[in-house]
């Protein structure tokens, strides 16, 4: 089958070794594998001429997500499914669905400006972030009213999320099909560039991952977990993450994509 990866330009601008290895393995399975960055092309979307049987959405840009929506609308297969990616990328819909799935997650509010969240500080610190952000972009820890009144927020809706105290590290949970890994990384805006260290995945985390996989309809995804004194809290879900720090994830990623491509 023809499989095309919709990629993003990384920083630094070098291909992901994990994605490259997954592509190589898919080729050995008999697939014809290509990949390109949607922002580098002039893409007609009212009439599509597909060049692949399955598109793998690796990029999280708005352009790539919209193009995946156009592909989906024409009945062209996308992995992960477009609707699942759209739900995960929008923190409003993701948070609501996690509550429905009984996945522990912080209280969350949708706001139009930072100043609308002032009253929330009466009960403690909050996190402000874009409603469609990823990789920690635009995330702010707010502890005082002055931070909100002086904050220069990006255009568009924002999320105010109750701050969850933790050990100073995020637990990054990565999933490919039924396989679950966990990696601990320091919590800061550059954490996505670090590999972190692989750690044991306990049964509670496995159960959370299984609920998200089933409820969202995702096959390749990650979630950010804060290990709070009251138990784990999921603060974000991302489709097709980087899998940095996972022990040899490429074969499992390739096998998952192969299974989706073959419809099994």
Each model region followed by its residue ranges:
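A long amphipathic alpha-helix within ATP-dependent nucleotide-binding catalytic cores
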Residues: 189-234, 238, 246-264
